[in-house]
Amino acid sequence: MPTILTIFAWRVAIYPNDHRPAHVHVLGGGCEAVFHLRCPDGPPVLRENYGFSRGDLNKVLLQLEAHLAPMCRAWRALYGDF
């Protein structure tokens, strides 16, 4: 799975052979969360959370918002339209 961004110690990845809508998986420390990107304009929204604290999710969300454009470009490069 391509890592498209690193946020603190967490990897932001798009799984190969994944499905629409455009989304990313955030992994690290035994936790995983999935965020819909809502490309091209956002804002990203949490879809699933497995183990991240609310505070950590807020940190992740701020970084996803700040890096939305390159993540949407990465999704489009792998899968086409959002």
Segments and roles (model prediction):
Residues F52-F82:
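C-terminal structural segments of small proteins and small subunits
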Residues M1-A22:
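Short, charged/polar N-terminal "headpieces" of proteins
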Residues P2, W10, G42, Q63-L64, ...:
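Functionally constrained cores in energy, signaling, and assembly domains
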Residues Y15-R54:
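A short, structured beta-strand/loop element
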